[in-house]
Amino acid sequence: MDVSQYLEIFLDESNEHLQTLSDQLIILEKEPDNSDTINEIFRAAHSLKGMAGTMGYKRMQNLTHDMENVFSEVRNGNMEVNSNLVDVLFQCLDALETYVDNIRETQDEGTDDNEPIIKALNAFIASEGKGNCLLYTSPSP
């Protein structure tokens, strides 16, 4: 499928959703029980997942899928937001911004699957948000 005709729309909408994620994560950091914020983050991740999947950006789709899973658990009351989770979510935001930057420059998301971040998200689900997981830290340059 030739997606070039949709690329500009994808980039514009991705930037809007990334800005929403950024704004809402800042609120979530201060108000971890804010259900409106939790719902906004879920919707932004869900929208990014769908758009990435449609465009064939599987790495971006996988990361946003796991973010969506975390927020589904939070929304259902199965886990609580804590500072460790917020830190990982900011790492997700950075990774998503990198994917979008790569797509803007090369029409390709790149080769980084962000496996350590995905593992951290899944560890939160497994520990029911109790923070009993190792956080991903970026390697030093």
Q: How should each PLM-predicted stretch be described?
A:
Residues 141:
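Hydrophobic pocket-lining residues within nucleotide cofactor-binding pockets
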